[in-house]
Regions:
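Structured domain cores in non-transmembrane regions
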Residues: 1-52, 56-57
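Ser/Thr- (and often Asn-) enriched beta-sheet segments in non-cytosolic proteins
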Residues: 21-25, 65, 71, 126-132
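A structural detector for beta-sheet-dominated domains
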Residues: 27-29, 58, 73-75, 130-134
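An exposed acidic His-Trp-rich patch
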Residues: 44-94
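Activation corresponds to long, low-complexity, non-globular regions
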Residues: 78-140
Length: 140
């Protein structure tokens, strides 16, 4: 397990803005899958993550490499009724305390299936997720 909470070039955990990045390193073997999560901060309970299966880190025994953003989905956790992104009074940083929004149905679902009347950005306009295999000593 790895945590990515310290921006590249920073000395301590912090949020990032446009153009900044987080990095983390993991060790994996064929058959390993990756799952990551990151909250869509200007929401009640939305988060980014791959599908339930995770992202396969190897294909035909070789590590994958490159942009995997297309495998990251915006999900609704189902814990609070959604308010308009970036405006709702029960969203960080405007909420007075954690968990102040009205309870929802508790069902996690892809935001594309949620009929709340709001528009959400495409994942690729919010983040880019890339995989870069480490160089193995002695490998060509």
């Amino acid at each position: 397990m790895a945590v990515f909470n310290t921006p590249v070039g920073a000395k301590s955990p912090a949020p990032i803005g446009p153009g900044a990045a987080y990095e983390c390193s993991i060790e994996a073997a064929p058959g390993s899958k990756l799952t990551i999560t990151s909250m869509f901060g200007q929401s009640n309970d939305l988060f980014y993550a791959p599908n339930e299966s995770g992202i396969a880190l190897f294909k035909d025994g070789k590590p994958i490499s490159g942009d995997i953003t297309s495998q990251i989905i915006l999900w609704d956790a189902g814990t609070e009724v959604n308010q308009e992104p970036g405006i709702g009074s029960d969203q960080a940083p405007r909420q007075k305390a954690p968990n102040t929004g009205k309870d929802e149905n508790g069902v996690v679902q892809n935001i594309k299936k949620v009929k709340d009347g709001f528009k959400y950005p495409k994942t690729a306009s919010v983040m880019k997720v890339t995989i870069t295999p480490a160089k193995t000593p002695g490998a060509n």
